[in-house]
Amino acid sequence: TICHTGYRSEDYSDRSFITRMKALGCPDIIFIFGATNDYWAKSPLGEYKYADWSKKDLYSFRPAMAYMLDTMIDYYPNVEIYFLLNDGLGNEITESVRTICKHYQIDCIELKGLDKMSGHPSVKGMKQISEQVKAYMAVHGK
């Protein structure tokens, strides 16, 4: 999960994206493929919040995602950051990702029609992700 709330409302603060985001080494480019487990775990959405986050805020998706992007932009200067948005997520979380990415001017690559097994991309689905990311990058001159 991006936020600290996981499955069965358990505390995932030891393994959430926002806990691990500073452990990526020295990348040239970052693709964040998140929000799926937040959606599946029914993590609370929370309110849009773009500053002054409390620890409690980070247990809800919207403020945690904003905190993550805000922190990563500062922590990884001169690194291209992209968000990969899975298909098949609910409208509220999909719109939340779009809104927060737009706020931070982060490209949101919306994946479509992925082949999946038990909700996870199959080998074919992983190839589709690769193809869609390559196509997005080509169209946007990246």
Q: What are the roles of these predicted feature ranges?
A:
Residues S16, W53-Y67, T71, E92, ...:
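Extracytoplasmic/secreted proteins, especially bacterial periplasmic and envelope-associated proteins
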Residues G34, L69-Y76, Y104-Q105, V133, ...:
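Sec/Tat-exported extracytoplasmic proteins
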Residues F33-N37, A64-R98:
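Active-site segments of SGNH/GDSL-like serine hydrolases
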Residues M117-K142:
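Histidine-centered active-site loop/cap adjacent to the catalytic His
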Residues I2-G6, F33-N37, L84-G88, E110-L114, ...:
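Active-site-proximal beta-strand/loop segments in catalytic clefts of secreted hydrolases
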Residues T1-K55, H120:
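Conserved SGNH/GDSL esterase-like catalytic core that processes O-acyl groups on lipids
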Residues V97-E110, D115:
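Von Willebrand factor A/integrin I-like adhesion domains
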Residues G25-I30, Y76-I81, Y104-D107:
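Loop/turn elements at helix/coil->beta-strand transitions in domains of secreted/extracellular proteins
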